[in-house]
Amino acid sequence: YQHVKAFPRYISATHSICEDLEKRRILLENLQDEENKDGDHPKLWKNFAMALGADEKEIENVTLDWFTKDMIDNFFSQARKSYAEGLASLYTYERQIPEIAETKIQGLKKFYGVSSKEGLEFFEAHKSADVIHRAECEKLLDSLSKEEQEKAEQASMYTARYLWNFLSGMTSKHKLETIAA
C-alpha cells in the first residue's frame, strides 16, 4: 500500500522537473489517472486489501519493511535526479503492470474467492490504463538524447533491482514457496 500511496508523488516529482510542456502533459494525464477523484489508486488498493479482510487503520499504520522503504526511496531518488531517470523508473514499473494485473485478477478469483468490484478494481484499472501509460512512456523514452537514454537505462536497472528486492523480501517475510520459471 505504501508504494501505491507514494506512486503519484513519483510521477509528480518527475513532472515537476520536466521542462517540455507536451511531455509534462503526458505525465500529468498519468498523475490524474492515479489521483482520480472517483477512485484514486491508493483508495482502490485499500479497497482490495479490505476485500481480503484487512482493517483500514492497519493499512495506513503498517510499519514499512526495509525492502519496501528502500524501493520507495529509490523511486523518489530517481524521480528527483532528472526527467530521464524519473521517466525510466516509472516505465520500469509500469511496463509490466498490465500483464501482472491480469494474472493477479485470475489468481485472486481462483485461489482467494475475490470477485467483488472493490476487491478487483485496482487491478482492473491497471490492466487497461497502464497499457496506455506504457506506450506513452516508450515514446517519451525514445525522444531522449543519447546521453539521457544512458541515464535512463541506468535508472531502469536500479529500479528493477529494488523491485526484485521488494518481491524477494515479501517472499521471505511471508515464507512463500518460490518456483523458478
Language model features: what each stretch is:
Residues Y1-A181:
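Non-heme di-metal
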